[in-house]
């Protein structure tokens, strides 16, 4: 609770076209190698090192972790992401704030999109080549930026062995970007093309890299895996203390050096523009 309260009260002035950008991603790490933890939380039978799995929501532009779910062993990232979306959407500190949620290709699912739509939240997602058939059809087409209609009937859900209780009909905007390898990357969103042209969608997804940088600092600067406790409750507390330290450091550095430009991650800048439709 202390972590969430301090994150909510911290200054968060930076936005993208008036919107907060929230990236969601997961991180795995090692737990202390005790007999008790090794017996319960090893990733595989051959591996004797117990692990944890954490899924976090990161305010990209303000470089702040605002929510996180800590799980012993391997977790269902989509399930934990859904719980965080519910929590943020109902939190008095966040629910009325304009926000865009960003996900890498391991997260998109019908249920996650339904949840975001039900909460009236905007999103940008990178999708895999085995997503909804309508999105796959767009991938095979020559379109670059196109709105498609999704109709997920009860019959379709049964045939695909998918549990669906949310919105069954909705529109998705598909955006194609070209990677340096020559492959196409498909992003899906519910942001309007007039307000957010293709270049903005690409930039929003590019900014997702901030959460990867945050995880890197947690592991290599805050040393999140260097636990003090050996009990499960204590280990969880140690983890959230690491997030507190990260957020405090961000606030202090931001207030002391507000005008220092950040180093650009050039590896994500090499996306080529495709010709328009």
Label each residue range with its predicted role.
Residues 5:
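Phosphate-interacting basic helix/loop segments used at nucleotide- and nucleic-acid interfaces
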Residues 38-39:
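Short secondary-structure boundary/capping segments
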């Amino acid at each position: 609770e202390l972590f969430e309260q301090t994150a909510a009260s911290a200054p968060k002035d930076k936005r993208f076209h008036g919107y907060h950008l929230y990236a969601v991603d997961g991180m795995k790490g090692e737990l202390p190698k005790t007999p008790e933890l090794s017996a319960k939380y090893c990733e595989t039978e051959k591996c004797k090192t117990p692990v944890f799995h954490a899924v976090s929501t990161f305010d990209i532009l303000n470089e702040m972790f605002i929510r996180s779910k800590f799980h012993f062993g391997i977790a269902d990232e989509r399930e934990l992401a859904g719980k965080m979306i519910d929590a943020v959407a109902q939190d008095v500190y966040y629910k009325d704030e304009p926000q865009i949620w960003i996900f890498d290709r391991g997260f998109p699912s019908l249920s996650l999109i339904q949840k975001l739509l039900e909460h009236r939240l905007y999103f940008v997602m990178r999708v895999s080549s085995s997503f909804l058939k309508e999105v796959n059809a767009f991938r095979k087409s020559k379109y670059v930026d196109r709105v498609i209609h999704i109709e997920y009937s009860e019959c379709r859900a049964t045939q695909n062995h998918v549990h669906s209780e949310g919105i069954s009909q909705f529109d998705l905007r598909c955006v194609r970007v070209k990677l340096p390898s020559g492959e196409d990357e498909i992003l899906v969103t519910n942001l309007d093309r007039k307000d957010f042209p293709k270049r903005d969608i690409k930039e929003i997804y590019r900014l997702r890299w901030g959460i990867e940088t945050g995880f890197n600092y947690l592991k290599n600067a805050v040393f999140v895996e260097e636990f003090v406790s050996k009990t499960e409750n204590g280990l969880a507390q140690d983890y959230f203390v690491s997030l507190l330290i990260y957020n405090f450091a961000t606030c202090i550095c931001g207030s002391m050096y507000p005008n220092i430009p950040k180093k650009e991650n050039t590896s994500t800048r090499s996306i080529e523009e495709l010709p328009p439709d």
